[in-house]
Amino acid sequence: MFNISYAKRNAKYLFKLLAWCMMIEEAGPNIGNKQKVVLQLSKMLIMYIILHINAAFWTWRGYLKRCVLHFVFPRIFLPLLSDSPTITQAKKPSYCFAMDVGGEDISDLQVDQIVEEYSMDDLIRDRFRLSAISIAEAEAKKNGMEIGGPVVACVADLAFKYAENVAKDLELFAHHAGRKVVNMDDVVLSAHRNDNLAASLRSLCNELKAKEPQSERKRKKGSAKKEDKASSSNAVRITTDL
């Protein structure tokens, strides 16, 4: 990984190489094969340095995101996050560039996509840990208990891994059914594999039913009664016809 200082040291050579390449291109068709090879190598070197600068910029942008998160959320969670080795160790940005045989088509779009995915994964993981830590501390206060920082960090990591496994199961269920989108059928199948998750879903359904307005309940009950009456009247008509 090349850091900002490395990119700054090579930035001054970037402009010299650009000026040199412009002078060679202005020479037109009179240049020989040797000069053309030098021109292509110079372009490759320029893109190589640009990629280093770009990777360093994306790395520091990820650090800025983490700093914003630490300032937005309460400060009582900061020592717990700093103790976690997976948060303190920054991921190295993966970067590459593609070119054709002639060396003319060079793009760094893959750099932006790969580093952006890494930064979003870190952001989601940090937010999930903060939520798990806040829930654990709230439950500890409710029950009059005390929880150590390393214990809460381990619980948060386990909860995140469990959530990742549930997401993978849902994706596999949807893929097995020939779908690209997860629906409630996949959630039900995943709940059958875990009693605790099934109980949580049942309690959530009961809470939603309890919060449902009374008018909608009466409408549903009235429509159900009308359907029962219609079915019974149809049965009576069929018996009289016979």
UniProtKB/Swiss-Prot annotation:
The keyword DNA repair belongs to this UniProt entry's keyword annotation: yes
GO function term, MF aspect, one: protein heterodimerization activity
Cellular compartments per GO CC: FANCM-MHF complex
Disruption phenotype: No visible phenotype under normal growth conditions, but mutant plants exhibit a defect in somatic homologous recombination.
Top-rank lineage group of the source organism: Eukaryota
One GO BP: mitotic recombination
Biased composition, class Polar residues, residue ranges: 231-242
Subcellular localization, as worded in the UniProt entry: Nucleus
Annotated spans, Disordered: 208-242
UniProt keyword terms in alphabetical order: DNA damage, DNA recombination, DNA repair, DNA-binding, Nucleus
UniProt cross-references to Pfam families, sorted A to Z: CENP-S (PF15630)
Listed SUPFAM superfamilies: Histone-fold (SSF47113)
Family the UniProt entry places it in: Belongs to the TAF9 family. CENP-S/MHF1 subfamily.
Function (record text): Involved in the promotion of spontaneous somatic homologous recombination (HR) events, which is opposite to the function of FANCM in ordered HR. Only FANCM is essential for replicative repair in the absence of the endonuclease MUS81. Acts in the same pathway as FANCM to restrain class II meiotic crossing over (CO), and acts with FANCM during meiosis to repair interstrand cross-links (ICLs). This common pathway between MHF1 and FANCM is in parallel to the pathway that involves the RECQ4A helicase.
Protein name stated in the entry: Protein MHF1 homolog
Species of origin: Arabidopsis thaliana
